[in-house]
């Protein structure tokens, strides 16, 4: 039987660009795992992508995944834009290079191992698991830049 995993992700950035963090909560049966990390110089979109990447890469075998994100950038990118980008050799419709293509390629590879149901959740709307993912992203931001309070 294929394992079922529920994931909540979020990214945070102090300045854009600036120090940033990502966080994710993974649920598998009655088990819960929280992860976070950060980078000293990044963007909010890169941190949103990293949260999903890190969570999916943590899974050591193919799973049925329900992944929740409050990022329209991640949702539209993975569900709509990525097919065109790949078909055009990682160029946008106007022939510009895709921003963050290194992370989009990594996310594409990470999701290929799993059956992922992408779910959008409204950010900062009081959803407890999204709020926890946000807190983890902010913890990752603090780890990347201890001077950020």
From Swiss-Prot:
Keyword Metal-binding applies: yes
Residue positions binding Mg(2+) 1: 10, 48, 70
GO biological process: DNA replication, removal of RNA primer
A Pfam family matched in the record: RNase_H
Annotated EC: 3.1.26.4
Protein localization: Cytoplasm
GO molecular function annotation: magnesium ion binding; nucleic acid binding; RNA-DNA hybrid ribonuclease activity
Domain of life: Bacteria
InterPro entries with a match to the protein in the record: RNase_H, RNaseH-like_sf, RNaseH_domain, RNaseH_sf, RNaseHI
Cofactor or coenzyme needed: Mg(2+)
Domain RNase H type-1: from-to ranges: 1-142
Chain positions recorded as Mg(2+) 2 binding sites: 10, 134
Coiled-coil portions: none
Cell inner membrane as UniProt keyword: no
SUPFAM superfamilies: Ribonuclease H-like
Catalytic activity, reaction form: Endonucleolytic cleavage to 5'-phosphomonoester
GO annotations of cellular component type: cytoplasm
Keyword annotations from UniProtKB, A to Z: Cytoplasm, Endonuclease, Hydrolase, Magnesium, Metal-binding, Nuclease
Job of this protein: Endonuclease that specifically degrades the RNA of RNA-DNA hybrids.
Assembly with partners or alone: Monomer.
Family recorded in the similarity comment: Belongs to the RNase H family.
Official protein name in the record: Ribonuclease H
Species annotation: Caulobacter vibrioides (strain NA1000 / CB15N)
């Amino acid at each position: 039987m294929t394992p079922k995993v529920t994931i909540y992700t979020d990214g945070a950035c102090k300045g854009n660009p600036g120090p940033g963090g990502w966080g994710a909560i993974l649920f598998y049966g009655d088990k819960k795992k929280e992860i976070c990390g950060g980078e000293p110089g990044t963007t909010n979109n890169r941190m949103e992508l990293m949260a999903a990447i890190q969570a999916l890469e943590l899974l050591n075998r193919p799973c049925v995944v329900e992944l929740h994100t409050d990022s329209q950038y991640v949702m539209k990118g993975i569900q709509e834009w990525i097919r065109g980008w790949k078909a055009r050799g990682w160029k946008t419709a106007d022939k510009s290079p895709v921003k963050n293509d290194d992370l989009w390629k990594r996310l594409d590879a990470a999701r290929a191992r799993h059956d992922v149901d992408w779910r959008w959740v409204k950010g900062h709307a009081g959803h407890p698991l999204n709020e926890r993912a946000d807190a983890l992203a902010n913890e990752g931001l603090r780890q990347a830049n201890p001077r950020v309070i």
